[in-house]
Design a protein with these regions (language model features):
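Structural signature of hydrophobic alpha-helical transmembrane segments
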Residues: 22-28, 77-89, 109-112
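Membrane-interface helix-boundary motifs at transmembrane edges
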Residues: 40-53, 101-107, 157-168
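A glycine-rich, hydrophobic loop/mini-helix early in the fold
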Residues: 48-100
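Aromatic-anchored segments of alpha-helical transmembrane domains
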Residues: 59-68, 115-126, 174-183
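Membrane-interface helix caps and helix-loop-helix hairpins in membrane proteins
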Residues: 71-80, 101-106, 126-139
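Membrane-interface loop-to-helix entry segments
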Residues: 84-85, 138-149
C-alpha cells in the first residue's frame, strides 16, 4: 500500500456488521433516540420550550466537536477536502440544532426528510470519512442519531408537519445542492489536489459501504440509482410522517392524497 492509499484508508473507515462496535453503537443509538422522544412527549409549557433550547445548545456543541478536535489535536490534519460540514448529514446536523431556536417550517421539512434518510443509512452502513478516532466515532453516532430523532420530536411534541408536496420540493432542493457540491468537489480536486480527494455528498466517487442502493458504476452513472433511491425514500418518509402526524388540511381527503401528497 502506497502513502496515498494509506492516507485515504485512514479517512474512509467503514464499520462492518461483523464488528462488535457496529451493534453496540447501533443499539445504543436506537435506545437513546426512543428514550429522548418519549421524554419530550411528557413535557409541557415552559419546561418543553427549555428542553428544546437545551437540546439545540447541546447539538451546536456536538457539531463543533470535529473542528475543535482537529484544531486542538496536533496529530490531526484539518483538510478542506474532508473536514468541511457539507455532507448532507453535516448540513442537517447544523440545521436540526439551529431549528431548535428558529422553529422554521422549511428547515424542518428539509432536515426531516434528508436527515432521516442520511441518518438511518449512516447508522446501518457507517462510513466515517475523517477516520474513527474515539471522539470522531462518538460524534458520528450522536450526530446521525440526532438528525433522525430531532425532527420526530419537532413533529410529535411541537406540531410541525410536512406541507403538501413537501417531498418534491425537498428532492429539487437536494438535487440542486448536491450538484453544486459536486462542482465544489471538482474545483478542489482539480485546482487544489491533495493526498485525499474531496468527496462531499459522495458526488466524486460512490460510497464504499455495502448498500443495495450503491451500485458499482463509473462516475457519474452511479449517481442515477442514488437519485432514484432518494425519491423512493422521500415517498416512504412522507407516508410514515403523514401516518404518525397527519396534516389537518387533508382530513377528509382520500387515503392516497393524505399519505402521498
Amino acid at each position: 500500500m502506497n502513502e496515498s492509499e494509506a492516507v485515504k484508508q485512514a479517512y474512509d473507515v467503514v464499520i462492518h456488521m461483523d464488528e462488535p462496535r457496529y451493534w453496540y453503537f447501533l443499539l445504543a443509538s436506537v435506545l437513546a433516540g426512543f428514550v429522548v422522544v418519549q421524554a419530550f412527549q411528557k413535557l409541557t409549557g415552559a419546561s418543553k420550550e427549555r428542553a428544546l433550547r437545551n437540546m439545540g445548545i447541546f447539538m451546536v456543541a456536538v457539531n463543533l466537536v470535529p473542528p475543535l478536535y482537529g484544531l486542538l489535536n496536533p496529530d490531526v490534519d484539518l483538510n478542506i477536502h474532508r473536514n468541511l460540514p457539507v455532507h448532507f448529514c453535516g448540513i442537517n446536523g447544523w440545521l436540526v440544532a439551529l431549528n431548535c431556536f428558529w422553529k422554521n417550517q422549511k428547515v424542518f421539512t428539509f432536515s426531516a426528510f434528508l436527515g432521516t434518510i442520511g441518518g438511518v443509512h449512516a447508522l446501518l452502513t457507517p462510513q466515517l470519512t475523517i477516520g474513527d478516532a474515539p471522539v470522531i466515532l462518538t460524534h458520528y453516532y450522536f450526530n446521525h442519531t440526532a438528525i433522525v430523532v430531532i425532527p420526530i420530536i419537532m413533529a410529535r411534541a411541537y406540531g410541525f408537519r410536512f406541507p403538501k408536496w413537501g417531498w418534491i420540493w425537498t428532492y429539487v432542493a437536494a438535487a440542486v445542492l448536491s450538484t453544486s457540491v459536486g462542482v465544489f468537489n471538482w474545483y478542489l480536486n482539480t485546482y487544489h489536489p491533495a493526498d485525499v480527494t474531496a468527496n462531499y455528498m459522495y458526488m466524486w466517487e460512490a460510497p464504499k459501504v455495502d448498500n443495495p442502493f450503491v451500485q458499482d458504476m463509473a462516475w457519474p452513472w452511479y449517481i442515477l440509482p442514488l437519485h432514484a433511491a432518494l425519491l423512493l425514500h422521500l415517498v416512504v418518509i412522507n407516508f410514515c410522517y403523514r401516518w404518525g402526524t397527519p396534516l389537518e388540511s387533508l382530513v377528509g381527503k382520500s387515503w392516497a392524497v393524505r399519505r402521498f401528497t
